């Protein structure tokens, strides 16, 4: 979270609140601020497979604990969803290339949370950035080293409808 403060400053963001939750359902911040945020970003703990080109040694650790990570991501998303107000958005991001952490996680979230809908990431991208959409068809942002010359990255945008 300390690095986020510097990144916000560089980006000119002044109205962001950085919070590290306890991971418990009875977290006092969750109770106090439920359904109050326009935008919640979940920078999910993940396998980091998208950073293999910069950290190739992590390839040998990729399968260690994947099931645990997927379960943790699911729990973090569910808690974060409680923070988003009606009409607000929840962004789920990983630096993973593994579908279980990305598309499957997004689809499972939508199935479990009918009060949210996917917002096509291309729509969001083109509304705020002057550069062309870097991905193929689909609702999610998925950058890959092979296609984009970047680290692997995934993002899904959800909007609370009720």
Regions found by a protein language model. Name each.
Residues 1-162:
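S-adenosylmethionine
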């Amino acid at each position: 979270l300390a690095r986020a403060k510097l990144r916000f400053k560089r980006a000119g963001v002044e109205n962001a609140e950085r919070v590290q939750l306890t991971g418990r359902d009875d977290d006092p911040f969750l109770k106090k601020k439920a359904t109050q945020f326009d935008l919640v970003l979940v920078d999910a703990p993940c396998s980091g497979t998208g950073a293999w080109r910069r950290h190739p040694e992590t390839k040998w650790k990729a399968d260690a604990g994947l099931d645990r990570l997927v379960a943790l991501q699911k729990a973090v998303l569910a808690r974060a969803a409680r923070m988003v107000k009606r009409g607000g958005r929840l962004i789920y991001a990983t630096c993973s290339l593994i579908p279980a952490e990305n598309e499957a996680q997004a689809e499972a979230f939508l199935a479990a949370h009918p009060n949210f809908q996917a917002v096509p990431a291309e729509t969001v991208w083109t509304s705020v950035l002057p550069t062309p959409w870097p991905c193929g068809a689909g609702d999610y942002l998925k950058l890959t080293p092979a296609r984009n010359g970047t680290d692997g990255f995934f993002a899904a945008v959800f909007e609370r409808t009720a």
